[in-house]
Amino acid sequence: TAIMSIFGCSPRKYFFGRAPLEAAASGIRLAPGDACYRCNMVTYADEDVPFEHKHIISHSAGSIEGRESDELVTMLFDHPDFRPLAEQAGMVIHKGSSFRHLAVQSHVDIKGIQLAPPHDHLGEEIGPILPTGCPNADVLRELMRRAFDILDQHPINVARRAAGKLPANGVWFWAEGTAAALPNFPEHYGSDGGVVSAVPLCHGIGILTGLEAVTVPTATGEWDTDYAAKVAAALGVLKKHDFVALHLEGPDEATHNHDLEHKIYSIERLSADVVAPVTEALRAAGEDFRLLLLSDHMTYMANGAHGADPVPFVLYDSRVSDGSGLPYSEANGRKGPYVDDGAELMDLLFELKKL
């Protein structure tokens, strides 16, 4: 919902689930009665306990690379012990990037269903956070249980353990939703543009709002992404359009993994290799510009989970010389103006509203 707000779409009005937004990025069209879920490849701890008592230790199977992830999820949905159950549930899988896949279930009622984001429950026993709330939740739980039985000792996971990597020994359904429609960005703001991101959610929101989705082949969505290529792609968008949204996921993923070293590294690269060259290029172009810098939400090192605390933002205008003079940080953000509704930030950027 935070990313939607940044694009000026109030989640209170337009949010129908995260997975349908990601589906839009992949060209997946949802029909009436369809439900879409994110299907993460995850890691359960190696422990000899019933499935409900297992602990989830990675929401991304150790940031599994795409080839192995694709091979595992394809094998799973073709497996004779899994395929009949998936077909009975009306579920098909759409392969995504790295650990992120999408599952679409046809002719299903998900009213009341409760699914938990895996990244908010790392280290926890899964029993209390397995799907619940409606009859279809039982179907998803059985699919998840069956997936573990099939995936745990698959040769790919045996090899991953031997190499010191986390196995992708489970799938996790979450981010449920139905078909979504969002307001047209160019019509509302009078500017067309594009979205540069390695995350399907951002591309999906961009597509549904009438923006161009730009893919950078060397972008990983992690701390080791190709920062220079993403900057080049963003500046390329501005040669054709008036607006670009440049998104980086590295600090968030590092925090989910409790990886302080690479969280700091990502932030330093963001400052030196993204914000600085983008700002310099805009100044060199010789035209007035405005720049909005912010994160979409907090992610805490203490527990690796997302949080709803306000995030600091910078709104820079090349026509204005005076500013706060303070470094960009959470502490200094609290000293500045407070915007209660995140969907108003884009109005501020385009000067439709004032602070």
Region locations from a protein language model:
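Feature captures the catalytic ectodomains and active-site-proximal regions of enzymes
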Residues: 1-355
